[in-house]
Amino acid sequence: MPKPINVRVTTMDAELEFAIQPNTTGKQLFDQVVKTVGLREVWFFGLQYVDSKGYSTWLKLNKKVTQQDVKKENPLQFKFRAKFFPEDVSEELIQEITQRLFFLQVKEAILNDEIYCPPETAVLLASYAVQAKYGDYNKEIHKPGYLANDRLLPQRVLEQHKLTKEQWEERIQNWHEEHRGMLREDSIMEYLKIAQDLEMYGVNYFEIKNKKGTELWLGVDALGLNIYEHDDKLTPKIGFPWSEIRNISFNDKKFVIKPIDKKAPDFVFYAPRLRINKRILALCMGNHELYMRRRKPDTIEVQQMKAQAREEKHQKQLERAQLENEKKKREIAEKEKERIEREKEELMERLRQIEEQTMKAQKELEEQTRKALELDQERKRAKEEAERLEKERRAAEEAKSAIAKQAADQMKNQEQLAAELAEFTAKIALLEEAKKKKEEEATEWQHKAFAAQEDLEKTKEELKTVMSAPPPPPPPPVVPPTENEHDEHDENNAEASAELSNDGVMNHRSEEERVTETQKNERVNKQLQALSSELAQARDETKKTQNDVLHAENVKAGRDKYKTLRQIRQGNTKQRIDEFEAM
């Protein structure tokens, strides 16, 4: 039995390992990969490998893997990548797995500067990538520095601006906050919708020459063939939509495109190597087929996939709505719990204050009772003193009477008796005055005692009112695509041709009516302009690249990808071919 061959296939987010037989075809390996990752939109993808000469090449599906010039390694290395790009991601990419693989591949191309992206758009795209990774921004979880380990901006952008990591994070975070409530898969789609408007998105560039020998770039993409000047990959100068082309062929390094317009001459260019022409032919056929397929009614399979995707999205939206509802309920319950806790604390504080007041009143009552007792004792003493004085007065009266009687009886010693009488009279007057003074003191003490008694009664009444007040109520309970494949390595097979059918298609050139995603959203467009102005203040003009200069010129002239597309397709096919020959 033949020995199995180990194969490693790297997708954008996983590594897959298989053991294949020596007679396994490219299609059998490809089918095994798409089945493993659960992909149905297979027409966009292919398996890429590095050949023995170091060139990156697409695996041919109709040939055995072992018969192709795959670099001899163990295991054999392949990359599963998008080979063809859609015209409109929101209309064509159906499955989430397809959207995710495109997102990761496009993001990598932007970060590696294979697709030029202006700084302000790079920040916007970064915010969608962050939303896709982290979900909604939450200041409790996403603390400063939460993006420190993420590669989010092209190195060119970082080097061109005098901004710290923290300042870049702040700008990305501002937009991340705005995406609140956006599903992760919707963030991926928003990223792709912005990215597909970038001039270099989905374009395969090939170095070519016209008959004059002028070095140019040929761009092959989902919409057709475009010609670029050698120093400008951003702005094509001439364009040919797929609907204008009826035949493509090559003979050695010469490539011939026959237009549908019989009056127009052939469109001829030259590639540096035969293998380049083989690759151009394969890409032209695949892109043309997809271009025509898009302009015909969907197949049953695609209709079913779209229906299933709509159902899955609807289900996710329902689940999210349910989660949001539960979250709101939980937040309400938390707020209610906090309110009850707050009220409980307020009641406890009120109770503490009442207790303090009660204790204070109790102390005052005790003090007043003590004072009342003291006053009563003083009153008693004053009374006793008054009684004593009264007794003395009576005794004095009696003595006076006796002396008076004695005086009456004894007139003998009248002067002596008169003196004694005067003495007693004076003494009586003093005692009368002392008695009067003590009676006044007793009266005063009596008034003070009555006032103290009234204060005591009043305090007792207040205490009774405080003690009889109902206790505070308890807190309420908490409610909780086909392509004609040619061997790029077979230098003997030096010519090939393919007819491109344009039958039965609807609205051939609808792409010329498109506008960019940011033009559809005035708010985002204004934010991008504001950020562009802000970043311009921090830009190091000495580090501008050729693409930066070209992009700035396009913006100043009011050009974008679709306006340029309309412009470069103006005039008939013959005029544009003549223009190409004159370059």
Swiss-Prot record:
<dbReference type="Pfam" id="PF20492">
    <property type="entry name" value="ERM_helical"/>
</dbReference>
<keyword id="KW-0009">Actin-binding</keyword>
<dbReference type="GO" id="GO:1902115">
    <property type="term" value="P:regulation of organelle assembly"/>
</dbReference>
<dbReference type="InterPro" id="IPR011174">
    <property type="entry name" value="ERM"/>
</dbReference>
<keyword id="KW-0206">Cytoskeleton</keyword>
<dbReference type="InterPro" id="IPR018979">
    <property type="entry name" value="FERM_N"/>
</dbReference>
<feature type="binding site">
    <location>
        <begin position="60"/>
        <end position="63"/>
    </location>
    <ligand>
        <name>a 1,2-diacyl-sn-glycero-3-phospho-(1D-myo-inositol)</name>
    </ligand>
</feature>
<dbReference type="InterPro" id="IPR019748">
    <property type="entry name" value="FERM_central"/>
</dbReference>
<dbReference type="InterPro" id="IPR014352">
    <property type="entry name" value="FERM/acyl-CoA-bd_prot_sf"/>
</dbReference>
<feature type="compositionally biased region" description="Basic and acidic residues">
    <location>
        <begin position="483"/>
        <end position="492"/>
    </location>
</feature>
<feature type="region of interest" description="Disordered">
    <location>
        <begin position="458"/>
        <end position="526"/>
    </location>
</feature>
<dbReference type="GO" id="GO:0005886">
    <property type="term" value="C:plasma membrane"/>
</dbReference>
<feature type="compositionally biased region" description="Pro residues">
    <location>
        <begin position="469"/>
        <end position="480"/>
    </location>
</feature>
<keyword id="KW-0117">Actin capping</keyword>
<dbReference type="InterPro" id="IPR035963">
    <property type="entry name" value="FERM_2"/>
</dbReference>
<feature type="domain" description="FERM">
    <location>
        <begin position="5"/>
        <end position="295"/>
    </location>
</feature>
<dbReference type="InterPro" id="IPR019749">
    <property type="entry name" value="Band_41_domain"/>
</dbReference>
<dbReference type="InterPro" id="IPR000299">
    <property type="entry name" value="FERM_domain"/>
</dbReference>
<dbReference type="Pfam" id="PF09380">
    <property type="entry name" value="FERM_C"/>
</dbReference>
<feature type="region of interest" description="Disordered">
    <location>
        <begin position="310"/>
        <end position="336"/>
    </location>
</feature>
<dbReference type="GO" id="GO:0005902">
    <property type="term" value="C:microvillus"/>
</dbReference>
<dbReference type="InterPro" id="IPR018980">
    <property type="entry name" value="FERM_PH-like_C"/>
</dbReference>
<dbReference type="InterPro" id="IPR000798">
    <property type="entry name" value="Ez/rad/moesin-like"/>
</dbReference>
<protein>
    <recommendedName>
        <fullName>Radixin</fullName>
    </recommendedName>
</protein>
<dbReference type="GO" id="GO:0005737">
    <property type="term" value="C:cytoplasm"/>
</dbReference>
<keyword id="KW-0966">Cell projection</keyword>
<feature type="binding site">
    <location>
        <position position="278"/>
    </location>
    <ligand>
        <name>a 1,2-diacyl-sn-glycero-3-phospho-(1D-myo-inositol)</name>
    </ligand>
</feature>
<dbReference type="GO" id="GO:0032154">
    <property type="term" value="C:cleavage furrow"/>
</dbReference>
<dbReference type="InterPro" id="IPR011259">
    <property type="entry name" value="ERM_C_dom"/>
</dbReference>
<dbReference type="GO" id="GO:2000643">
    <property type="term" value="P:positive regulation of early endosome to late endosome transport"/>
</dbReference>
<feature type="compositionally biased region" description="Basic and acidic residues">
    <location>
        <begin position="374"/>
        <end position="400"/>
    </location>
</feature>
<dbReference type="GO" id="GO:0030175">
    <property type="term" value="C:filopodium"/>
</dbReference>
<dbReference type="InterPro" id="IPR008954">
    <property type="entry name" value="Moesin_tail_sf"/>
</dbReference>
<feature type="modified residue" description="N6-succinyllysine">
    <location>
        <position position="83"/>
    </location>
</feature>
<dbReference type="GO" id="GO:0050839">
    <property type="term" value="F:cell adhesion molecule binding"/>
</dbReference>
<dbReference type="InterPro" id="IPR011993">
    <property type="entry name" value="PH-like_dom_sf"/>
</dbReference>
<comment type="function">
    <text>Probably plays a crucial role in the binding of the barbed end of actin filaments to the plasma membrane.</text>
</comment>
<keyword id="KW-1003">Cell membrane</keyword>
<dbReference type="GO" id="GO:0005912">
    <property type="term" value="C:adherens junction"/>
</dbReference>
<comment type="subunit">
    <text>Interacts with CPNE1 (via VWFA domain) and CPNE4 (via VWFA domain). Binds NHERF1. Interacts with NHERF1, NHERF2, LAYN, MME/NEP and ICAM2. Interacts (via FERM domain) with SPN/CD43 cytoplasmic tail. Interacts with CD44. Interacts with CLIC5; may work together in a complex which also includes EZR and MYO6 to stabilize linkages between the plasma membrane and subjacent actin cytoskeleton at the base of stereocilia.</text>
</comment>
<dbReference type="Pfam" id="PF00769">
    <property type="entry name" value="ERM_C"/>
</dbReference>
<feature type="compositionally biased region" description="Basic and acidic residues">
    <location>
        <begin position="506"/>
        <end position="525"/>
    </location>
</feature>
